[in-house]
């Protein structure tokens, strides 16, 4: 899963998802979340080769919803600019489609910048992802699991770009936002299923 700010939707859906560093990126690209962390990631080395490079060379996907960063965006915690969740969408891709269409990718078992995190480049190693944690809404560390928050933020990283043919669906928070996205897709003559997260399976209540 990958979050996009709404002003970025039309360009990324029409063409491809590009990294922040790409010369093909949307000129109106807007960073959301922790700007300092985003900048730190640009030159943070990916600890597996292939595919190698830095995190700034990759498009990051979460495996599930309710990320810690989304909560920070919702609440404005840690000085992060507060935004309504309705301004965000999830762009959903299937791993099998990315593997088939994107030549360079890897994934982690936790937050990519954490020293404890391992990187993998073999689909067989998806067993190292803590699927119970990445799919839960409640991810805080406690005495029972002091590593839950790191594991919650496991990432699938795709190098350079992701073609729109990999987009299996779009998740929005409200019916109003569904109508807005439908208008964009219709204008671009693109058919992508849209799902309203009425039960808060991905967005926070």
Give the location of each predicted region.
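Conserved NAD+-utilizing ADP-ribose enzyme module
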Residues: 15, 54-57, 69-205
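Single conserved hydrophobic/aromatic residue that forms the stacking wall/gate
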Residues: 1-13
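Glycine-rich loop/turn
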Residues: 14-60, 65-83
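Residue-level signal for well-ordered alpha-helical segments
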Residues: 11, 38-48, 144-149, 158
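Surface-exposed loop/turn and secondary-structure junction residues enriched for glycine/proline
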Residues: 4, 20, 33, 38, ...
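Short, flexible, glycine/charge-rich loop motifs used to bind or transfer phosphoryl groups or to couple energy/partner
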Residues: 1-2, 49-50, 160
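Short hydrophobic-aromatic micro-motifs
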Residues: 6-7, 61-63, 91
């Amino acid at each position: 899963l990958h979050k996009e700010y709404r002003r970025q939707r039309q360009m990324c859906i029409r063409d491809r998802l590009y990294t922040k560093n790409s010369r093909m990126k949307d000129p109106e690209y807007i960073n959301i979340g922790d700007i300092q962390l985003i900048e730190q990631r640009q030159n943070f080395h990916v600890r597996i080769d292939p595919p190698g490079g830095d995190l700034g060379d990759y498009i990051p996907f979460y495996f599930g919803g309710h990320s810690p960063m989304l909560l920070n965006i919702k609440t404005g915690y840690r000085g992060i600019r507060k935004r309504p969740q309705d301004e965000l969408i999830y762009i959903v891709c299937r791993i099998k489609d990315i593997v088939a269409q994107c030549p360079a990718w890897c994934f982690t078992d936790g937050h990519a910048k954490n020293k404890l995190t391992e990187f993998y480049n073999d689909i067989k190693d998806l067993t190292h992802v803590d699927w119970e944690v990445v799919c839960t809404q409640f991810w805080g560390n406690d005495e029972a699991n002091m590593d839950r928050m790191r594991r919650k933020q496991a990432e699938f990283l795709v190098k350079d770009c992701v073609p729109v043919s990999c987009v299996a669906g779009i998740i929005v928070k409200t019916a109003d936002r569904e109508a807005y996205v439908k208008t964009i897709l219709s204008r671009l003559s693109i058919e992508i299923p849209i799902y309203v997260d009425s039960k808060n399976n991905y967005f926070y209540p």
